[in-house]
Amino acid sequence: SDKANNVQVWLDKNFAQANRLPDLESAGFKPVSGRLTTTEQGAAAMVVYKDSEGRTLSFFIRPPGEANHLLPRGSRRDGELQADYWSGSGYNYAVVGPADDPAAQAARLALKQPI
């Protein structure tokens, strides 16, 4: 979609060499907006994905920090939320959403495909 392409262009402009946005369309989620922020290590961003029912997931990208601490692929649950994370092309990434929501679980399965 045009909106997804616009979010990708915005991300490419702000994060040279970063991986492309995760394709979560097979789970019904499309990127709809993004926010740029800063960390001690440099620019970071959050991209919001939404499905046709209005459910949302958040995608985060940030630099790894001074020690260049890259993450192995993994997941972590905290209360009602689950984060699935990985590293690539010099950045750390995460997708965060409701842990027990079937739509979010379908998105997690889509993430397991090569990114």
List the model feature ranges, each with a label:
Residues 1-115:
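Polar, acidic low-complexity tracts enriched in Ser/Thr/Gln/Glu with frequent Gly/Pro and Thr-Pro motifs
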